[in-house]
């Protein structure tokens, strides 16, 4: 199990409050969204994995925002395609 120091992660993000928000978002993605870890899991909990990803510079607020925007666009496109196919069958 790798040791994570919060100070190292804070230096990547800027302040501890943003660190908490970003780490919580990422941990939630891994727990409920089925997102894969970007670092070896090593039997760590999602919160520790999220902090390790932030510490290594793999996850930032901008990265999370971009991923969520992309997923939202893909979902909207799928919904539009479904509605379009229903409209064409009528």
Curated annotation (Swiss-Prot):
Its EC number is 2.7.7.6. It comes from the Bacteria. GO terms for molecular function: DNA binding; DNA-directed RNA polymerase activity. Gene3D superfamilies: 3.90.940.10. InterPro entries: DNA-dir_RNA_pol_omega, Pol_omega/Rpo6/RPB6, RPB6/omega-like_sf. Keywords: DNA-directed RNA polymerase, Nucleotidyltransferase, Transcription, Transferase. It catalyses: RNA(n) + a ribonucleoside 5'-triphosphate = RNA(n+1) + diphosphate. GO terms for cellular component: DNA-directed RNA polymerase complex. Promotes RNA polymerase assembly. Latches the N- and C-terminal regions of the beta' subunit thereby facilitating its interaction with the beta and alpha subunits. This is DNA-directed RNA polymerase subunit omega.
């Amino acid at each position: 199990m790798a040791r994570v120091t919060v100070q190292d992660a804070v230096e990547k993000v800027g302040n501890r409050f943003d660190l908490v928000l970003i780490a919580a978002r990422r941990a939630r993605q891994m727990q409920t969204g089925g997102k894969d870890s970007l670092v070896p899991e090593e039997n760590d909990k999602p919160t520790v994995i999220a902090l390790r990803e932030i510490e290594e510079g793999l996850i930032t607020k901008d990265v999370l925002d971009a991923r969520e925007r992309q997923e939202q666009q893909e979902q909207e496109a799928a919904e539009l395609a479904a509605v379009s196919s229903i409209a064409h069958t009528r």
